[in-house]
Every structure is written in structure tokens, then in C-alpha cells.
Amino acid sequence: MRDQMKALVTGGAGFIGSNLVDRLLAEDHEVDVLDDLSSGSLANQAEARADRANRLTFHQVDIRDPHVVDLVARRQPEVVYHLAAQADVRVSVTRPVFDAEVNVIGTVNVLEGARVAGTRKVVFASSGGTIYGEPDPAALPCKESHPQAPLSPYGVTKRVAFDYLRVYRELHGIEFTALALANVYGPRQDPHGEAGVVAIFAGRLLSVEPCTVFGDGEQTRDYVYVDDVVDAFVRATSKGGGLLVNVGTGIETSVNQLYSAMARSAGVDRPAAMAPERPGELARSALDPGRAAIHLGWRPWTTVEDGTSRVLDWFKQSA
């Protein structure tokens, strides 16, 4: 990336977004953050505010607000990293209108602001775990060419947002890269929510509370560490134009395997509590990172064992 780039990060007080903001500031860029703090926290930016406050500007705003267009236009970012979203699959099922307002209308507001500002690139956080639907096991790990058949309104909004990015590129010349993220985990992930099993397990293991595994625990996910994901966002600043790019490890890890590894690392010798399978949960998921290697020069380097150990250490230090 060029020195002293002007960047804007939506959702920059959230889990992934705040880690991205830290990386951008560490590389001496000027960063605007847009976040309504509905799920993000200013605590995630405490270190950045203390060390680099002169290059960080925070705006508490909901991306559904039409004024976002003017705000983005005024800030004139060279690159927009669009991570703000309603990201809870269950909420998208129970509140589909709200989900669409945030993830579709909000995205259009951000894109309109970028158009007026003359932004050269938008890097978008898509969802590899939802846009492909229930993949054929023979197709795992999924490539970007896999048919897209979302099974939730959330997955649909991510697919629609990609089409808006494509259209804005064709009509207005705004370059984009959409990163289809696998199951991201790492420091600052919320241990109290419904999503983010690594953070949930970490919080419960360290507080000596039982961890719950739903179904038989053999459902698999592709767990990718947040620092690796941030590196993909940074690389996409100048690469991968016009593409959907998977950001995952290509490795399936079952929930049982995940729990066993984390329990060992935490020094806990007790089985997880078992609960009935949750309806609508994917049986298996993994993303092929081959396109990311070719077009972004990106590869994941953090193993699940190393990454989950770092998460446990972070939770201990944050207690």
C-alpha cells in the first residue's frame, strides 16, 4: 500500500474491523471509522486511540442513515473497507427487513458515498459460510465457482451486495474485491453471543463453565485466525480487482476437535455438554483459498492449535 493512504473502515469498532484498523494505523495510514456500536465497542479501539489518536477519527453512525452518503463523501477516502453488517444469521431469519436494511441499503449508502468521494477501491466483507449454502461434500473445500444458494436472508444480502459492487464498478469505475470469509476467530470476539464458538468456548473454559456442543459435534467449519484475515484485507487494497475471493484455510475442523484442542490448551479435563442439533445448521463447510494465493498472494499461516491458544491467552490477559 502507498504511504499515508486515507482509509475508511465501516464496522471498525467490531471484532474484525478493529483489528484491521490497528493494522492500518500501524502502517501509518489515516483512518476514519464508521460504527453504530450496536455490536462493536470503543474498548476495541482503546489502544489505537491512546497511541495514534491524531490519525484516527471515529464517527458513531448507522449505515442505514442517508447522511452516511455525505459523511463518506466529505471524508474522501481512497479506500473503503466495508465490514459493517447485521451478521447474525438467526436475526436475519426473524427480522429479515432489518437485515436487508442494514446489509443492502446500508451498503448502497456506503457505495454512494464512495462514488461521490471518488474512492478508488472498496474491499467488502462477504460470507463464505452462507453464500454457498449447503455444499455438496464432494465439492469441499468450496471454490468461488461453487453455485451460490444461500439458506438464510443474511446469505442473500451478501450475494446482493456483491451485485451492487459489480454494478458500481461497471457504472462508476469503483474497483472492488469481495472477501468471502470463513469462520473468523481471534482476540476481541464476543464470548457472550450466539456466534463465534471459539470465543464462547474460551470464555466458558476459563470461567469453569460447561461448554455446550450441539448435535453430535461432527459438524465441521473452516476456522481462520483474525490476523490472517486482516492480512487478506490489506492485500486486497491493491489486488484482486472485481473478484470474489475466499479467505479460509481449506481445512475442516469438527466442533468436537475444536473443543478437545481448546480444553487441552486450557488445562481442562472434562467433556462438553451435549445438546440437540440446532435446525438449519450446515453439516460441513470449508473454503478453498487457492484464488487468494494467486490473486492476493495470501495464504493462512495460523493453525487452529496456535490460534486458539492465542485466544485463550488474550482472554486471560483481558480478565
What are these regions (language model features)?
Residues 1-184:
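N-terminal Rossmann-like NAD(P)+-binding domain of SDR-like oxidoreductases, especially those catalyzing
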Residues 39, 187, 249:
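Short, conserved catalytic or interaction motifs in soluble domains
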Residues 44, 135, 189, 224, ...:
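Short, well-ordered secondary-structure micro-motifs
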Residues 62, 203-319:
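C-terminal substrate-binding subdomain of Rossmann-fold SDR/epimerase-dehydratase oxidoreductases
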Residues 92, 145-149, 176-190, 200-224, ...:
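A conserved pocket-lining segment of Rossmann-fold NAD(P)-dependent short-chain dehydrogenase/reductase
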Residues 160, 164, 168, 201, ...:
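Hydrophobic alpha-helix immediately C-terminal to the catalytic Tyr-X-X-X-Lys motif of short-chain
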